[in-house]
Amino acid sequence: MQFYSWMHAINARNNWLVASLILAALPSHAALVDGHLEDEILPILQRNLAGTFAADAVIHDRETVTIGFVNFDPSGFIPIDDDNLGGDDANRLKNELKTITLPLTLALPWHGSVWESYVTGRLGYTQRFHDISLFEELDPSRDHEKLKIYSAFFAGGVHWDGLKNWRFTAELGGSIRRLEQEYTYNNAISQIFQPVFDGVLTNFSLNTWMLQPSLALQYQKRWSKHKLKYRSRYAYMHGESFGSDIPPHQVDIKASSWRNTLYYSHPIGRMLDISFAGQLSASRVDLSGNTNEAFQTPHYYEFGLDLLMGTGAYGEGWLDNVSIGLLFNYGSVLKGGSLVFNYNTY
């Protein structure tokens, strides 16, 4: 989702724009599409909507970004003065975000000596509830925004293992997403805007479809019980909104992400048919299009330290492994540290 409020974006515009809106005080949506208002407000709203949907697709793509269930600011105990390492704003943002992803992948019966096919799908839910301070010098009351996104993704793909230690994967998928935005006007000044903004900028819902193809190349080397793995994956997103005849809600989505990750797994031991290993990982993620705008950076880095547990016979056929560990995001709007939990790690 776009990681800053649309109302903050409007508040940051020139003072003459705010004054003109107050003077207009029109109770219809036409106020948002006449004259200079069209040039000022509509592009902001459309970019924010496109960024919101693109960021949500990235959030529920487990190979691109992970949001932890406990977040912290590593700059509090790492003696490095670097704004890209973390901060109070990033930590507060991650605590405001709540996500649930329910994925499932099944092998298909069509396969050959060096290739196999599969289908995968996932249901996703994202929410951000937060307070917004506007015109504090006139009224300290805070507005409240609730943003919810529901998604369903389905894809089919092929693995090709024709070269020793190498795997190539091609996948074609698509998703449907629904955004619901609720905005409570508590501030006396912001209430002036409510007749103009409701249904367009605030208190509305919107649907989109997205095509999401991806290509991945993986190298894996094992010796003894150690494992070294490199994985490179490029994912593209293209989509449009549908079901709305309001011009600001007619949105095109174009974005991509390219993740390169190096993993090293070191065996620890085995207990009750469960294998334990420590895993180190380092990633660089390059973003373009609407994802670049949403994360406010063209690229960021992730560093992970995990305890990986193979499930053995306990999860045969559906659960290969689970892991718990620390993840550090460097350079994006989600910078900082997190305690994370994953399963079926690649």
Predicted segments with their positions:
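Cleavable N-terminal export/targeting peptides
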Residues: 1-86, 111-115
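Surface-exposed strand-loop-strand hairpins of Gram-negative outer-membrane beta-barrel proteins
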Residues: 66-97, 129-147
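Short N-terminal helix-initiation segments at or just after the protein's N-terminus
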Residues: 61-66, 225-227, 266-275
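Outer membrane beta-barrel transmembrane domains
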Residues: 240-346
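Residue-level detector of the transmembrane beta-barrel scaffold of outer-membrane proteins
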Residues: 66-75, 111-122, 167-171, 227-231, ...
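Long, compositionally biased low-complexity segments
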Residues: 85-109, 116-118, 124-126
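Outer-membrane pore/translocation modules
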Residues: 35-43, 109-257, 263, 282, ...
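Residue-level signature of outer-membrane beta-barrel architecture
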Residues: 104-110, 156-162, 215-221, 266-270, ...
